Amino acid sequence: MVRIRLMRLGAKKKPFYRVVVADAKARRNGPFIEIIGTYNPKTDPPEVNLNMERVNYWIDKGAQPSDTVKKLIERVSA
């Protein structure tokens, strides 16, 4: 199964995330299929950049977004 989830980057106490499409069995920061966005929770307000065209493509192909990514998609779509 393919999932849309967050990949953690940045330094200690300063997280920065990539929104990636990856196999569900792959490690959090392991191999991924495609980068479809970024999320920076440390800015005010938190910065979310998603390529909605690719998000919709992968969801149509059967990819399951994680709970956090679902919330980010809702925030961008609103």
UniProtKB/Swiss-Prot annotation:
Gene3D superfamilies: 3.30.1320.10. NCBIfam families: S16 (TIGR00002). InterPro entries: Ribosomal_bS16 (IPR000307), Ribosomal_bS16_dom_sf (IPR023803). Belongs to the bacterial ribosomal protein bS16 family. The keyword Ribonucleoprotein applies. It comes from Thermodesulfovibrio yellowstonii (strain ATCC 51303 / DSM 11347 / YP87). One of its GO terms (biological process) is translation. The keyword Protein biosynthesis does not apply. Pfam families: Ribosomal_S16. This is Small ribosomal subunit protein bS16. PANTHER family: 30S RIBOSOMAL PROTEIN S16, SMALL RIBOSOMAL SUBUNIT PROTEIN BS16M. The gene is rpsP.
